[in-house]
């Protein structure tokens, strides 16, 4: 074995693109995070968490329509994904689709998350739903 590495070390390493994307997102590099998420999704096309993270990154890069599309795709894979209901609701509300936003807010509130920040998100969703319900254009809801 003159100067040769053992055969095992020549095996390609499988990268964890999801964790790489999360790390890049924490650093504020959302474009690079999206690239990593795309690679992760290519390897795991049924992982709704990857689509959720892509939607968040699209939101942070000012691409709300792409974010909405990815949130909805994540919900097709996992309808109980409360983070996707929350995220898409507020994008739909900004777009002016209050009725569809209300449906997602109700789905979010039906199975609210747990954890240290959960109460803030729950209050925000409840407030938005009240605002939608009291809006003159939404009296037919």
Where are these regions (language model features)?
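Conserved structural position within tetratricopeptide repeats
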Residues: 39-42, 72-76, 110
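TPR/TPR-like (Sel1-like) alpha-helical repeat modules
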Residues: 90-116, 123, 127-130
């Amino acid at each position: 074995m003159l100067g040769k590495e053992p055969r095992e070390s020549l095996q390609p390493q499988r990268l964890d693109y999801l964790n790489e994307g999360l790390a890049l997102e924490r650093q504020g590099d959302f474009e690079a995070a999206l690239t990593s998420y795309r690679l992760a999704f290519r390897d795991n096309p049924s992982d709704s968490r990857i689509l959720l993270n892509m939607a968040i990154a699209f939101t942070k890069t000012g691409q709300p329509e792409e974010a909405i599309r990815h949130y909805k795709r994540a919900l097709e894979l996992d309808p109980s994904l409360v983070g996707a209901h929350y995220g898409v609701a507020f994008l739909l509300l900004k777009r002016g689709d209050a009725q569809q936003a209300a449906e997602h807010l109700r789905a979010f509130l039906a199975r609210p998350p747990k954890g240290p920040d959960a109460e803030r998100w729950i209050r925000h969703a409840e407030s938005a739903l009240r605002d939608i319900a009291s809006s003159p254009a939404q009296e037919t809801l």
